[in-house]
Amino acid sequence: MKLALGLAVCTLFAGALLWAQSDDFAEYQGWMKSNAATVADLNKSLTAKDGATAHTDVRKLQENLAMVMAYWQSRNVSDGVRFALNATYGLAQVDVLISQSKFDDAAAALKTAQASCGNCHMVHRDKAPDGSFKIKMK
Protein backbone atom coordinates (compact mmCIF):
# COMPACT_ATOMS: atom_id res chain seq x y z
CA MET A 1 0.00 0.00 0.00
CA LYS A 2 2.80 2.44 0.89
CA LEU A 3 4.59 1.62 -2.37
CA ALA A 4 1.43 2.20 -4.40
CA LEU A 5 0.78 5.47 -2.59
CA GLY A 6 4.38 6.54 -3.13
CA LEU A 7 4.19 5.76 -6.84
CA ALA A 8 0.89 7.61 -7.17
CA VAL A 9 2.28 10.69 -5.41
CA CYS A 10 5.45 10.61 -7.53
CA THR A 11 3.45 10.28 -10.75
CA LEU A 12 1.15 13.14 -9.80
CA PHE A 13 4.12 15.25 -8.75
CA ALA A 14 6.07 14.61 -11.96
CA GLY A 15 3.14 15.60 -14.15
CA ALA A 16 2.39 18.60 -12.01
CA LEU A 17 6.01 19.73 -12.10
CA LEU A 18 5.92 19.90 -15.88
CA TRP A 19 2.77 21.98 -15.74
CA ALA A 20 3.97 24.32 -12.98
CA GLN A 21 6.72 25.88 -15.05
CA SER A 22 4.26 28.61 -16.03
CA ASP A 23 3.42 31.46 -13.66
CA ASP A 24 -0.35 31.15 -13.48
CA PHE A 25 -1.45 32.60 -10.17
CA ALA A 26 -5.13 32.41 -11.13
CA GLU A 27 -4.89 28.64 -11.40
CA TYR A 28 -3.11 28.48 -8.04
CA GLN A 29 -5.98 30.45 -6.52
CA GLY A 30 -8.36 27.95 -8.10
CA TRP A 31 -6.65 25.07 -6.30
CA MET A 32 -6.87 26.92 -3.01
CA LYS A 33 -10.58 27.61 -3.47
CA SER A 34 -11.15 24.01 -4.56
CA ASN A 35 -9.27 22.78 -1.48
CA ALA A 36 -11.42 24.87 0.85
CA ALA A 37 -14.64 23.58 -0.70
CA THR A 38 -13.40 19.98 -0.83
CA VAL A 39 -12.26 20.00 2.81
CA ALA A 40 -15.74 21.21 3.78
CA ASP A 41 -17.26 18.40 1.71
CA LEU A 42 -14.85 15.87 3.22
CA ASN A 43 -15.81 16.93 6.74
CA LYS A 44 -19.48 16.41 5.84
CA SER A 45 -18.68 13.00 4.32
CA LEU A 46 -16.80 11.96 7.45
CA THR A 47 -19.65 13.10 9.70
CA ALA A 48 -22.10 11.14 7.54
CA LYS A 49 -19.72 8.14 7.54
CA ASP A 50 -19.90 8.12 3.73
CA GLY A 51 -16.67 6.34 2.84
CA ALA A 52 -17.08 6.40 -0.94
CA THR A 53 -17.61 10.15 -1.10
CA ALA A 54 -14.86 10.74 1.46
CA HIS A 55 -12.39 8.76 -0.68
CA THR A 56 -13.32 10.90 -3.69
CA ASP A 57 -12.78 14.07 -1.66
CA VAL A 58 -9.37 12.87 -0.47
CA ARG A 59 -8.32 12.07 -4.05
CA LYS A 60 -9.33 15.56 -5.21
CA LEU A 61 -7.30 17.15 -2.42
CA GLN A 62 -4.30 14.98 -3.25
CA GLU A 63 -4.51 15.97 -6.93
CA ASN A 64 -4.65 19.65 -6.00
CA LEU A 65 -1.76 19.30 -3.57
CA ALA A 66 0.36 17.65 -6.26
CA MET A 67 -0.12 20.80 -8.33
CA VAL A 68 0.59 23.03 -5.34
CA MET A 69 3.74 21.04 -4.59
CA ALA A 70 4.91 21.40 -8.18
CA TYR A 71 4.14 25.13 -8.10
CA TRP A 72 6.47 25.62 -5.15
CA GLN A 73 9.10 23.21 -6.49
CA SER A 74 9.32 25.07 -9.79
CA ARG A 75 10.01 28.25 -7.84
CA ASN A 76 12.62 26.63 -5.55
CA VAL A 77 10.59 27.31 -2.40
CA SER A 78 11.47 24.25 -0.34
CA ASP A 79 9.25 24.94 2.65
CA GLY A 80 6.23 25.33 0.36
CA VAL A 81 7.02 21.91 -1.08
CA ARG A 82 7.40 20.50 2.42
CA PHE A 83 4.07 21.94 3.61
CA ALA A 84 2.25 20.44 0.60
CA LEU A 85 4.01 17.10 1.00
CA ASN A 86 3.16 16.93 4.71
CA ALA A 87 -0.49 17.66 3.91
CA THR A 88 -0.43 14.94 1.24
CA TYR A 89 0.97 12.41 3.71
CA GLY A 90 -1.68 13.46 6.21
CA LEU A 91 -4.39 12.89 3.63
CA ALA A 92 -2.99 9.43 2.93
CA GLN A 93 -3.49 8.67 6.63
CA VAL A 94 -7.05 10.03 6.40
CA ASP A 95 -7.69 7.72 3.45
CA VAL A 96 -6.40 4.68 5.33
CA LEU A 97 -8.62 5.48 8.30
CA ILE A 98 -11.63 5.90 6.00
CA SER A 99 -10.89 2.45 4.53
CA GLN A 100 -11.00 1.07 8.07
CA SER A 101 -14.32 2.88 8.76
CA LYS A 102 -12.61 4.92 11.50
CA PHE A 103 -14.37 8.14 10.58
CA ASP A 104 -13.75 9.98 13.86
CA ASP A 105 -10.04 9.18 13.66
CA ALA A 106 -10.05 10.25 10.01
CA ALA A 107 -11.59 13.59 11.00
CA ALA A 108 -8.85 14.11 13.60
CA ALA A 109 -6.17 13.18 11.05
CA LEU A 110 -7.70 15.67 8.62
CA LYS A 111 -7.27 18.45 11.19
CA THR A 112 -3.59 17.51 11.47
CA ALA A 113 -3.21 17.59 7.68
CA GLN A 114 -4.92 20.98 7.58
CA ALA A 115 -2.32 22.31 10.02
CA SER A 116 0.27 21.97 7.24
CA CYS A 117 -1.95 24.11 5.02
CA GLY A 118 -2.31 26.70 7.76
CA ASN A 119 1.43 26.82 8.33
CA CYS A 120 2.01 27.47 4.63
CA HIS A 121 -0.61 30.22 4.64
CA MET A 122 1.11 31.92 7.58
CA VAL A 123 4.46 31.92 5.80
CA HIS A 124 3.45 32.50 2.18
CA ARG A 125 0.20 34.45 2.13
CA ASP A 126 -0.38 38.20 2.58
CA LYS A 127 -3.81 39.74 2.81
CA ALA A 128 -4.20 42.80 0.60
CA PRO A 129 -6.27 45.83 1.69
CA ASP A 130 -9.08 44.75 -0.66
CA GLY A 131 -9.36 41.38 1.12
CA SER A 132 -7.66 39.36 -1.60
CA PHE A 133 -4.51 37.38 -0.96
CA LYS A 134 -1.07 37.55 -2.51
CA ILE A 135 1.64 34.93 -2.41
CA LYS A 136 4.91 35.72 -0.66
CA MET A 137 7.96 33.89 -1.94
CA LYS A 138 9.83 35.00 1.22
Where does each model-flagged region fall?
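Short, charged, amphipathic alpha-helical segments
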Residues: 55-60, 81-85, 107-112
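Immediate post-signal-peptide N-terminus of mature secreted/exported proteins
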Residues: 20-57
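Short, solvent-exposed, charged loop/turn and helix-capping segments
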Residues: 64-83
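Flexible linker/context regions in extracytoplasmic redox proteins
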Residues: 25, 29-32, 36, 122-138
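The canonical Cys-X-X-Cys-His
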Residues: 113-124
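Bacterial N-terminal signal peptides
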Residues: 6-16
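Positively charged n-region of N-terminal signal peptides that target proteins for export
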Residues: 1-4
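Amphipathic, charged alpha-helical scaffolds that flank and support histidine-based chemistry
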Residues: 44-55, 91-111
